Amino acid sequence: MVKIITGKVNAGKTTTLLKTYRLDRKGDGFAAIKKMNGNEVYGYNMLHLSNDNIIPWMVHQKYYQRDFTKTGKFGPFYLNLDLLAMLESIIDELIAQRISPIYLDEVGVLEINGGGYHNILKKLLSSGLDLVIAVRDDLVKPVASHFDIKDYELVQVQGEE
């Protein structure tokens, strides 16, 4: 089963995903934690849920100082492509060990366009394991269509993160 946590930008999708995981600490996965500089988004760190390891994921171009060995770019953000390779390796282990559910935050335009977690999400969907993913509300249908997710439960988040 795929559970999609959805809401508008800053509605609390990541907070809801973290609360869902922390209720019983079953499964494993990753949450994208927003890093602020005053009122501006500095970037995002990736939190590995089972061990609380934090790894830089994206840095806004305004603050980027060649922080990553291998980079990609999405909008105004530089991506840590080494992190993606590491995430894929960890997800492969979770699939092999049949760890469930697996959490992934956040799936969106980058993945629809073949980047970010695209390959990771394809593997997860093929695995048959339970998934919990965060998706912005205006992207639920495009994500479900692109990844051929037909059966899913929606968790609507109304608040602000």
For the regions a language model picked out, list residue spans one by one.
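Walker A (P-loop) ATP-phosphate-binding motif of ABC ATPase nucleotide-binding domains
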Residues: 2
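Hydrophobic anchor at the beta1->P-loop junction of P-loop NTPases
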Residues: 5
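Walker A (P-loop) phosphate-binding loop of P-loop NTPases
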Residues: 10
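Conserved lysine of the Walker
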Residues: 13-14
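The feature captures the helix immediately C-terminal to the Walker
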Residues: 17-19
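N-terminal phosphate/diphosphate-binding loop that engages ATP/GTP or pyrophosphate donors
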Residues: 22-74
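Phosphate-binding/switch loop-helix module in NTP-utilizing enzymes
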Residues: 65-109, 122-123
